[in-house]
Amino acid sequence: MSGFVLAIDQGTTSTRAILFDGQMKVAGSGQKEFAQHYPASGWVEHDPEEIWASVVTTVKAALKNAGKAASDVAAIGITNQRETVVVWDRATGKPIHNAIVWQDRRTAPLCQKLKKQGLEKKFTRKTGLLLDPYFSGTKIAWILDKVKGGRKRAEKGELLAGTIDSFLIWRLTGGKVHATDATNASRTLVYNIAENAWDDELLAILNIPAKLLPQVKDCADDYGVTERDLFGAEIRILGVAGDQHAATIGQACFEPGMMKSTYGTGCFALLNTGSDLVRSKNRLLTTIAYRLNGKTTYALEGSIFIAGAAVQWLRDGIKVIGKAEQSGKLADEADPTQNVYLVPAFVGLGAPHWDAEARGAIFGLTRNSGPAEFARAALEAVAYQTRDLLDAMRKDWKGTSAKTVLRVDGGMVASDWTMQRLADILDAPVDRPTILETTALGAAWLAGSKAGVWPKAKEFAKSWALERRFKPEMDIATRSAKLAGWRDAVRRTLSA
């Protein structure tokens, strides 16, 4: 059997398809961006049809670029932007509304209402999550409430709902399979992570009929086969994981205590806690890292909504840079005597604050502040927010030592300046791997190992290779002063 495995990486701003060969090297790829829709303040939507078209286009491009046919591919692994939801017609496969994206804040009033009813502890105890618009459950409820006839059709069994992976699986299999994996399910706010099942009580609170939801499977499992006429041959779908979980796998963080952080649009740090379902006392999330062979591995997660998006804001919003790649060079030119802080709460603050009403702010500006100081503040904000997460993780999990090593991936980690500043602020080594396509690699490994053409976990972990380790160089006094300034800036940004 061929060792070629195709990863579909459906992200927030673009879709990528990457074909890996039997040595787990990239053989071909395709990428296509798609539109972001902002129908109201705090609202973010995607057109599911555009996402679907981007998947078909990029898969064909990856195969063409590699000079391979669909019949050469042993399996497909899917990884996706999490929490983003689609509700579609069971008969036609047509969405009844645009996908509501993970960044969307429209359900903040519903979350506040549920909090006032004293329900947050119940949701947290069962799902490991907090009552925040970030998660899928309230988004599904909103669509059913706001789309004409939505609730009635849902009760009659005419509709299906799911995260992006479920919608893609449904389309790829020609409507034969409605499924998701445990990691995506764990982000919905209605999945009991201790019992590994949809929670009837939480579904009732949000008035979501269980019949809408997909079957939950292991991350490496049988998700059906693609329709022959899509790519010219049937391809088995054997792996599915949310993007951050796939990155955890791609970084070979299989042992308790191992930690990875992905720096893309947002920043997401996951700490493997093994079979230990840790209840955070510091406003972190408890989530499923992955589920393999029926065994669940848990993680603590810190979610930061704005990381690379702050650099996009520098480029597209205030236009102080022409290209995102210029940010590190510009930051290096900043006046070291200026203490400018950017708190990038453009859509609220994530962990560990979880303040949906907070908004972005800049502190410490002087007449001499310019593009360089803005660039440095944007990049340093990523490091400061990661430090907040690491501190919370160290408080929450007894197995976390002060000798943490952070494995990093995502678009921002190509910047040496950003990675060095991250190591300085964390006071911990930061490891950048040789393969930066860790999210796609993780999805491919799930499918390839299930197909029997790629190695099992232990051998796969041995293949992880370090490109560069960034060691802390900042002195204690400077670090302490910078962190104190950051915490003061955050305090002044919080809504209450």
Curated annotation (Swiss-Prot):
GO terms for molecular function: ATP binding; glycerol kinase activity. Inhibited by fructose 1,6-bisphosphate (FBP). Sn-glycerol 3-phosphate binds at residues 12, 82-83, 134, 243. Glycerol binds at residues 82-83, 134, 243-244. Its EC number is 2.7.1.30. ATP binds at residues 12-14, 265, 308, 312, 411. Belongs to the FGGY kinase family. NCBIfam families: glycerol_kin, PRK00047.1. This is Glycerol kinase. The gene is glpK.
